[in-house]
Amino acid sequence: MNLVLASTSPRRKELLTHIGLGRAEFRFTQVAPDIDETPKAGELPRDYVQRLAAEKALAGLALCSGMSQPAVLGSDTIVVLENEILGKPVDEADAKRVLRALSGKAHTVMTAVALAKADQTSVRLVETLVRFCVLSDADIDAYVASQEPMDKAGSYGIQGLGGCFVESIEGSYSCVVGLPLVETRELLSEAGIR
């Protein structure tokens, strides 16, 4: 079985590498699938993130047509505040708007991971509750100026400077970073990949 990560995210690549526990025989390649990430009318956040993870895995599988026995991992992460999906910011003003909305509140981070093979696709969903401290305008301005939030769902990275804003989490840290390790290991183990 040839493992493929359907993502160019450096965070997902690093997390998937951790699953190998340093073993030289744990290898994977990466592809960059292109899918439409527009939510469907009335689609619930849980359904949306699981659909995107599966579509990324299947689109990645289509890119591996010449590969022997590909098993493709797709993943997607969203931040949900009061039932609104907060994706990646479109610009700095949007990042500031999102951070102001998260300030002093709890939100849910949902990450879905899917494994697609020729005959089946399996999906796991992980949810983590994250509570932010109250952010000042100066905090928000400085953080956005760092550019860190610009490629991240919810406009922050818990593993970077944005971790300064996290008061507490309930659930999986790796879910918030972008690839839930326990659930990903389970999917790989069920597929015979160790």
UniProtKB/Swiss-Prot annotation:
HAMAP family, per database record: Maf (MF_00528)
Catalytic activity reported: dTTP + H2O = dTMP + diphosphate + H(+); UTP + H2O = UMP + diphosphate + H(+)
Protein name: dTTP/UTP pyrophosphatase
The keyword Cytoplasm is assigned to this record: yes
EC number: 3.6.1.9
Keywords for the protein's UniProt record, in alphabetical order: Cytoplasm, Hydrolase, Nucleotide metabolism
Function: Nucleoside triphosphate pyrophosphatase that hydrolyzes dTTP and UTP. May have a dual role in cell division arrest and in preventing the incorporation of modified nucleotides into cellular nucleic acids.
GO terms for MF: dTTP diphosphatase activity; UTP diphosphatase activity
Active-site residues from the entry: D76 (proton acceptor)
GO BP: nucleotide metabolic process
Cofactor: a divalent metal cation
Important for substrate specificity, annotated site positions: R11, T77, Q159
Protein family (similarity comment): Belongs to the Maf family. YhdE subfamily.
GO CC field: cytoplasm
Subcellular location as annotated: Cytoplasm
NCBIfam families assigned: maf
InterPro entries: ITPase-like_fam, Maf-like
Keyword Lipoprotein: no
